[in-house]
Amino acid sequence: MTGPSSNNKRVKLWFDAKISAGVVVGGSVIADTGAWADTMTPNNNVGWQLTSNVFKLGDAGSNTQYAQGSAILGGSHGGIGLPVFPTAIETGAIVIALTGSSYTAAAANDLVATWFEVSAMN
């Protein structure tokens, strides 16, 4: 859910996120709302959703993946994003992170994530 403001907002879903001092500093963005400007797509007190699928690509141990995501902003579906090809080390931990910001106003609580789900198959 977004806060009751018309501040510009942005949400990103990261795969193999690199985190330093509590801030995501690297990784692959696998779903992104883009610059969610209220004047283009209303973002005052509306719902949002990011989804992405990540698949193993290539031979075992090649550390190559394929990801594709989409975003829904209020009542507007952003379509399917371009493919992303992460290179996470598959024998270690892979960090998945969700970031949100009110990037022009820096207002706290302008974006709220109410749940986060990861499903895996082998």
What are these regions (language model features)?
Residues 1-122:
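Surface-exposed molecular-recognition determinants
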